[in-house]
Amino acid sequence: MLLLWVSVVAASALAAPAPGADGQRRGAIQAWPDAPNVLLVVSDSFDGRLTFYPGSQVVKLPFINFMKAHGTSFLNAYTNSPICCPSRAAMWSGLFTHLTESWNNFKGLDPNYTTWMDVMEKHGYRTQKFGKLDYTSGHHSISNRVEAWTRDVAFLLRQEGRPMVNLAPKKTKVRVMQVDWKNTDRAVNWLRKEASNSTQPFVLYLGLNLPHPYPSPSSGENFGSSTFHTSRYWLKKVSYDAIKIPKWSPLSEMHPVDYYSSYTKNCTGKFTEKEIKNIRAFYYAMCAETDAMLGEIILALRQLGLLQKTIVIYTSDHGELAMEHRQFYKMSMYEASSHVPLLIMGPGIQANLQVSSVVSLVDIYPTMLDIAGIPLPQNLSGYSLLPSSSEMFKNEQKFKNLHPPWILSEFHGCNVNASTYMLRTNQWKYIAYSDGASVLPQLFDLSSDPDELTNIAAKFPEVTSSLDQKLRSIINYPKVSASVHQYNKEQFIKWKQSIGQNYSNVIANLRWHQDWLKKPKKYENAIDQWLKSHSDAKTI
């Protein structure tokens, strides 16, 4: 019944008249007569390409479509690091990954770090958050940490279960992801009990785990999340015939980093076309369930009379490869993994507007402060999205080009054996690795090769060189890679010392246990050799 109400919601006018611009610095004090409420919904692993054509044809997402019709869609929004914790650290801090040293899912922000929500609270906003946060240090499994720390070791081990699908027994089951639905209910109840009669403006955050794959218990307790799980109810929202089977390069022709990722993700074996299509169908169905949770929030705002007083933002920490480039999960700069949804609607936001310029998740921080009329810190990596989306600035050309014509994304975690850096511009995607010399770069022309099947770095050396110079002007990536390399060794040594005589047993039974236990001495020796290289013997 929930989805039938979309037409009712669509009938209400969302955009309040925006006051005329006076040419001054943007801010809520000028843009809104009263400080608006703000609601941010962040899902996990949602491919941003599903929010616009042609990706939008494969699955029904009525509430995302509602936000598109009544708000602004950013067609080229990207994560600043395609993995949970570092991506969220960038979003909550407004700073690039290397500036906060949020290297992996274990190393994020300090628990006491001042986020945009903290700043808004100090300026009179009532704040609340529910669900997945995952931007501070100290979380995730031992396996996840050790795999990230040892990615430079000269071995190749499967770290994930083979991707698979699992259908819920009850055909009509709607609430498949129980934890997310409970958190959605908590957010709705908070709106009803706490926000509806409050004289304070509020900022509410809801973090969802969907459409992240589920754990795979059949692969053993130490394997990760490789199961795409849903019910027939959600599968009916998927246009099966519209599902595209991605093209794969032969294993022998893959970029070496891609091969490492595919192998560690357990994707180098044989997959039938039916398997691939089912994985993608189940993933899209999980996206449909995510959309319904977003819908619960939108409907609650409408029912409480808050919809015309609230800026609603929807995005995701990263995407999901769903078997593109012979991989699932994220940890990649390919579009399926790095491209995220980003939609904004509410009073003063332009309706039915599509923005094609590149933006990224570090832009959330300044946007939040800008909505609240709070002066923006000068050290932020991000830029406010209001000049691109607000009614107030639609005729103000001098505000249109404040955001630079590029975004930076970087990755330093597990399942990838080299620090990775992406510079995305209007046409080009340039990907550099490690020190810039030991691993060949990649260059894709997304205007002619949207599926990123042809690396043209060698074909266009001038473009490659120019983009590399631009990247180095933004980040000294060889130096950052060296810092991460040293961090990984130091953290591994601390961990090894902390478990003492149990080391051999513990490391053998992490997520890679199926491969490790075949030749445990070989892999221990490989780690020893890695630790000895460029390290202080006394430390080891």
UniProtKB/Swiss-Prot annotation:
It holds the Pfam family Sulfatase. Its cofactor is Ca(2+). The modification 3-oxoalanine (Cys) is found at C84. This is Arylsulfatase K. Catalyzes the hydrolysis of pseudosubstrates such as p-nitrocatechol sulfate and p-nitrophenyl sulfate. Catalyzes the hydrolysis of the 2-sulfate groups of the 2-O-sulfo-D-glucuronate residues of chondroitin sulfate, heparin and heparitin sulfate. Acts selectively on 2-sulfoglucuronate and lacks activity against 2-sulfoiduronate. It is found in: Secreted; Lysosome. Belongs to the sulfatase family. The active site is at C84 (nucleophile). The keyword Lipid metabolism does not apply. Binds 1 Ca(2+) ion per subunit. The keyword Ligase does not apply. Glycans are attached at N112, N197, N266, N379, N417, N502. Ca(2+) binds at D44, C84, D317, H318. It catalyses: an aryl sulfate + H2O = a phenol + sulfate + H(+); Hydrolysis of the 2-sulfate groups of the 2-O-sulfo-D-glucuronate residues of chondroitin sulfate, heparin and heparitin sulfate. One of its GO terms (cellular component) is extracellular region. The conversion to 3-oxoalanine (also known as C-formylglycine, FGly), of a serine or cysteine residue in prokaryotes and of a cysteine residue in eukaryotes, is critical for catalytic activity. The 75-kDa precursor undergoes proteolytic processing to yield a 23 kDa form. GO terms for molecular function: arylsulfatase activity; glucuronate-2-sulfatase activity; metal ion binding. Substrate binds at K132, H255. Keywords: Calcium, Glycoprotein, Hydrolase, Lysosome, Metal-binding, Secreted, Signal. Its EC number is 3.1.6.1, 3.1.6.18. InterPro entries: Alkaline_phosphatase_core_sf, ARSK, GAG-degrading_sulfatase, Sulfatase_N. The gene is ARSK. Residues 1-22 form the signal peptide.
